C-alpha cells in the first residue's frame, strides 16, 4: 500500500502544478486520490501505449509487486508508525523500481493495490463522510467485458453503466447528473451541462467528490469576527475569521520562511495541513515560491514528528467555501495521457473488445466548505470573547494566501489539496 500512496501523492503535486501554472490568482480545490482511482479504473482496461502513458503520468509504474500480497489489515502498532515510517517506505519504493520495469505489466496488480487502499479508507468513514463518485458510462453499442465490470466492482467499489448516448444523449446526461447529485448529498449539481454530452459521446468518466468532517477541536463561533485578508500589497478582502487557542502540532520551514500547522478532524483519522508563507509585500510570489518547491517527499519531511511539535498556538483561520469544476482532457493530455482520448489510437480493449472505444470526456468537480465545526456545518459569527492571560502563544494568522492538504493519517494518503487565494 505504501507504494500506491507514494504514487498517488506524487501525482497530486504534478496535477496541482499543471492546473495552477497559468493563474496564481485563483482558488484551487481538487481530490487527486479520487482522480487517481478514476484513472485506475481506466488503466484496468487499457492496453499498449494507452496503458503505458497512464502508468507514467500517474506513477503507477512505481508500484511494488509484493505489497498486494501483504495482509489487508495493518496492526494498530503499524498504523501509529505510519507517518514516521513513510520516508523510509519511499526509499524502499524507489529502490525497487528498477526491478519492476517501465510499466505495470499485470493490470490487476493496480486493482489489488487500490482495493486495499480504498477499503482501508472506507473503514474509517464512521468518523467522516467521503463520497468519491467515480463511474464509467459507456455507449451501449460497446458491450462491456464482464471480467472488467467485475474487477471494477471488486477493486474500485463502483460500477460501469451502459447508456444510449447515440439515440438519447440528453436522457443519459440527466441520468449521470442525477447520480452525481445523489452521491454528493445534493451539493454537486449539473456535472455535465447541456452541451457537454451529445450523440458522438462513447465513454465518459465521472469524477465528483463530497467531503464532510468535524474538527477535533472546534472553533467557538462567538470568536469569529470580520477581519482583513490580504490578497496582495494593494488589495484586501473582509472575511469571517475564526479564532481559537490550544495545543496543536506546528513547525517552521526555514528554506521557505513558512509555517506548517496540523489541525486534526474528529478522532484524528484525518488532518488538514496548512502551509502559510510569511506575510510579505507580495503574498502571491511567496506562495508561488512554495508551490514550486513543494513535492511529495518534502511534505512528508515537513509534516513529520521531526519538524512538527505540539505547542500552544493562537490560530486565526478564515471560513471559506470552494467549488470548482475541471475539464481534464487537455490537462491530462499535457501530462502525457494522450492516446485514450484519441479515437484512432486508444486501446481500451480490456473494457470492451471493440477497437473503436475511446474516452470522450472526463470532468472533475469538487466542493468544500470550512467553518467553525469543520466542513459542511452551519456557519455562525458573533462577538469576540475575552481571553484570559495565558502562556506565550505561537501565532498562526492565515490572513493571506495559503496552501492546504487534507490527509488520511493511517495511510498518509493526500485526499485533497487546495490553494486559498481569496476566501
Curated annotation (Swiss-Prot):
<comment type="similarity">
    <text>Belongs to the serpin family. Ov-serpin subfamily.</text>
</comment>
<dbReference type="InterPro" id="IPR023795">
    <property type="entry name" value="Serpin_CS"/>
</dbReference>
<comment type="function">
    <text>Inhibits trypsin and plasmin, but not thrombin, coagulation factor Xa, or urokinase-type plasminogen activator. May play a role in cell differentiation.</text>
</comment>
<dbReference type="GO" id="GO:0005615">
    <property type="term" value="C:extracellular space"/>
</dbReference>
<keyword id="KW-0963">Cytoplasm</keyword>
<dbReference type="InterPro" id="IPR042185">
    <property type="entry name" value="Serpin_sf_2"/>
</dbReference>
<feature type="compositionally biased region" description="Polar residues">
    <location>
        <begin position="75"/>
        <end position="106"/>
    </location>
</feature>
<protein>
    <recommendedName>
        <fullName>Serpin B12</fullName>
    </recommendedName>
</protein>
<dbReference type="GO" id="GO:0002244">
    <property type="term" value="P:hematopoietic progenitor cell differentiation"/>
</dbReference>
<feature type="region of interest" description="Disordered">
    <location>
        <begin position="63"/>
        <end position="106"/>
    </location>
</feature>
<dbReference type="InterPro" id="IPR000215">
    <property type="entry name" value="Serpin_fam"/>
</dbReference>
<feature type="compositionally biased region" description="Basic and acidic residues">
    <location>
        <begin position="63"/>
        <end position="72"/>
    </location>
</feature>
<dbReference type="GO" id="GO:0005737">
    <property type="term" value="C:cytoplasm"/>
</dbReference>
<keyword id="KW-0722">Serine protease inhibitor</keyword>
<feature type="site" description="Reactive bond">
    <location>
        <begin position="388"/>
        <end position="389"/>
    </location>
</feature>
<dbReference type="InterPro" id="IPR042178">
    <property type="entry name" value="Serpin_sf_1"/>
</dbReference>
<dbReference type="InterPro" id="IPR036186">
    <property type="entry name" value="Serpin_sf"/>
</dbReference>
<comment type="subunit">
    <text>Interacts with SLFN12; as part of a pathway regulating cell differentiation.</text>
</comment>
<dbReference type="GO" id="GO:0004867">
    <property type="term" value="F:serine-type endopeptidase inhibitor activity"/>
</dbReference>
<dbReference type="GO" id="GO:0001533">
    <property type="term" value="C:cornified envelope"/>
</dbReference>
<dbReference type="Pfam" id="PF00079">
    <property type="entry name" value="Serpin"/>
</dbReference>
<keyword id="KW-0646">Protease inhibitor</keyword>
<dbReference type="InterPro" id="IPR023796">
    <property type="entry name" value="Serpin_dom"/>
</dbReference>
Amino acid at each position: 500500500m505504501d507504494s500506491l500512496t507514494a504514487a498517488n501523492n506524487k501525482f497530486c503535486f504534478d496535477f496541482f502544478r499543471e492546473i495552477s501554472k497559468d493563474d496564481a490568482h485563483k482558488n484551487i480545490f481538487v481530490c487527486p486520490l479520487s482522480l487517481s482511482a478514476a484513472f485506475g479504473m481506466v488503466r484496468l482496461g487499457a492496453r499498449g501505449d494507452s496503458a503505458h502513458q497512464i502508468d507514467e503520468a500517474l506513477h503507477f509504474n512505481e508500484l511494488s509487486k509484493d505489497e498486494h500480497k501483504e495482509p489487508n489489515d495493518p496492526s494498530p502498532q503499524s498504523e501509529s508508525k505510519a507517518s514516521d515510517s513513510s520516508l523510509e517506505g519511499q526509499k524502499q519504493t524507489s529502490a525497487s523500481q528498477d526491478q519492476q520495469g517501465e510499466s505495470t505489466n499485470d493490470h490487476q496488480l493496480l486493482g489489488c493495490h487500490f482495493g486495499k487502499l480504498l477499503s482501508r479508507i472506507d473503514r474509517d468513514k464512521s468518523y467522516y463522510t467521503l463520497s468519491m463518485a467515480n463511474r464509467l458510462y459507456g455507449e451501449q453499442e460497446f458491450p462491456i467485458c464482464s471480467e472488467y465490470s467485475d474487477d471494477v466492482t471488486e477493486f474500485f467499489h463502483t460500477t460501469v453503466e451502459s447508456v444510449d448516448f447515440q439515440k438519447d444523449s440528453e436522457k443519459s446526461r440527466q441520468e449521470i447528473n442525477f447520480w452525481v447529485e445523489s452521491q454528493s448529498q445534493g451539493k454537486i449539481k449539473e456535472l455535465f451541462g447541456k452541451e457537454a454530452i451529445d450523440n458522438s459521446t462513447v465513454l465518459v468518466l465521472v469524477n465528483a467528490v463530497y467531503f464532510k468532517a468535524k474538527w477535533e477541536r472546534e472553533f467557538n463561533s462567538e470568536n469569529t469576527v470580520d477581519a482583513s485578508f490580504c490578497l496582495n500589497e494593494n488589495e484586501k478582502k473582509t472575511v469571517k475569521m475564526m479564532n481559537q487557542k490550544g495545543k496543536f502540532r506546528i513547525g517552521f520551514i526555514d528554506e521557505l520562511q513558512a509555517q506548517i500547522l496540523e489541525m486534526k478532524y474528529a478522532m484524528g483519522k484525518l488532518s488538514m495541513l496548512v502551509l502559510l508563507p510569511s506575510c510579505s509585500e507580495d503574498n502571491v510570489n511567496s506562495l508561488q515560491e512554495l508551490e514550486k518547491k513543494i513535492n511529495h517527499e518534502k511534505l512528508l519531511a515537513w509534516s513529520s514528528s521531526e519538524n512538527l511539535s505540539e505547542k500552544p498556538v493562537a490560530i486565526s483561520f478564515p471560513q471559506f467555501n470552494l467549488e470548482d469544476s475541471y475539464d481534464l482532457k487537455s490537462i491530462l493530455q499535457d501530462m502525457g495521457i494522450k492516446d485514450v482520448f484519441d479515437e484512432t489510437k486508444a486501446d481500451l480493449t480490456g473494457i470492451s473488445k471493440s477497437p473503436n472505444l475511446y474516452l470522450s470526456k472526463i470532468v472533475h468537480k469538487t466542493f468544500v466548505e470550512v467553518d467553525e465545526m469543520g466542513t459542511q456545518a452551519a456557519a455562525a459569527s458573533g462577538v469576540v470573547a475575552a481571553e484570559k492571560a495565558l502562556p506565550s502563544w505561537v501565532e498562526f494568522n492565515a490572513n493571506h494566501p495559503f496552501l492546504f492538504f487534507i490527509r488520511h493519517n493511517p495511510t498518509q494518503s493526500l485526499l485533497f489539496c487546495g490553494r486559498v487565494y481569496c476566501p
